[in-house]
Amino acid sequence: MFSMILSGLICGALLGFVMQRGRFCLTGGFRDMYIVKNNRMFYALLIAISVQSVGVFALIQAGLLTYEAGAFPWLGTVIGGYIFGLGIVLAGGCATGTWYRAGEGLIGSWIALFTYMVMSAVMRSPHASGLNQTLQHYSTEHNSIAETFNLSVWPLVAVLLVITLWVVMKELKKPKLKVATLPPRRTGIAHILFEKRWHPFVTAVLIGLIALLAWPLSEATGRMFGLGITSPTANILQFLVAGDMKYINWGVFLVLGIFVGSFIAAKASREFRVRAADAQTTLRSGLGGVLMGFGASIAGGCSIGNGLVMTAMMTWQGWIGLVFMILGVWTASWLVYVRPQRKARLATAAAN
């Protein structure tokens, strides 16, 4: 038990620290792809996926890890991924983003985290068993893309690496925009860790390595998976309500560690502030959390479980879930940002 607690907390704290300092926000990244046509954060996600994919399949080939992709619940993945995408825009962050922003002191993220936790737990209760069983009927035999085409997984990993290297090199060749910065207050390692602006691609490499580390640490405790946010988040509430130790696992300490790591990073970099939410933000965050919990539960994963881990494992669930997650973000971005701005411009033009 002690080793499970320690390894889960350390892995989570590393992830929370890196995501907070690197401002690694997939919600903002997917939104920017649509609104400002900026794909940098998506390319960063591809880097993290690639690093993890190469590492995990190397460990599997060496006989150090085991993994079965199972069946592909396509209907739940499509519907859930889209709903989750809608929810993360309203909540102001994805599942992991909500955890690390709660560690920064954002009350809106606390609200989103609570409703996300409640809905995730509800979706694992007998009340949702009928819906879950119905969605499970709409599945295909193979979740693994390689198994579907009777291929080795390595050609797929190679294609991912080539695409990732190409888009990253293309992005790095673009002219750099100068960003105004304040004079540094710190020097050396303290400046790098707590003050210097982190490049998203460097952050992505670190996240990929942490995601890789999560596999052996998690499997050592009997949990045969890597990073995962939704189920452990639900497990916290299930344990608090039922008091049953069966809900305590490595993933629970992972998500608690994300909060701790983010808090440490925010305090050390002087970015921690308790920021209250107005009525509109409160309602939007609460609704966003509900949609996140519902969507991630029926999709079988969130932006980390499907978007980072299952994509790295070369599964249909990961890549198709990611596509519909992005489509959900774009739809919500149009409703929340683009449409109101367009209406405001038209009203201004009419007034003039």
From Swiss-Prot:
Where in or outside the cell it occurs: the entry states:
Cell inner membrane
**What happens after mutating C25S?**
Cannot complement a cysPUWA-tsuA deletion mutant
GO BP: thiosulfate transport
UniProt xrefs under Pfam families: Sulf_transp
Q: Which residues lie on this side of the membrane: Cytoplasmic?
A: 22-44, 92-102, 170-197, 269-289, 339-352
Please tell me whether the keyword Zinc is annotated for this protein: no
Q: Null mutant: what phenotype? A: The tsuA-cysPUWA and tsuA-cysA deletion mutants cannot grow with thiosulfate as sole sulfur source.
Q: What is the effect of changing C302A?
A: Cannot complement a cysPUWA-tsuA deletion mutant
As for family, the record states: Belongs to the TsuA/YedE (TC 9.B.102) family.
Report the PANTHER family cross-referenced here: INNER MEMBRANE PROTEIN YEDE, SULPHUR TRANSPORT DOMAIN-CONTAINING PROTEIN
Its biological purpose:
Mediates thiosulfate uptake.
Name this polypeptide is given: Thiosulfate transporter TsuA
- Species of origin: Escherichia coli (strain K12)
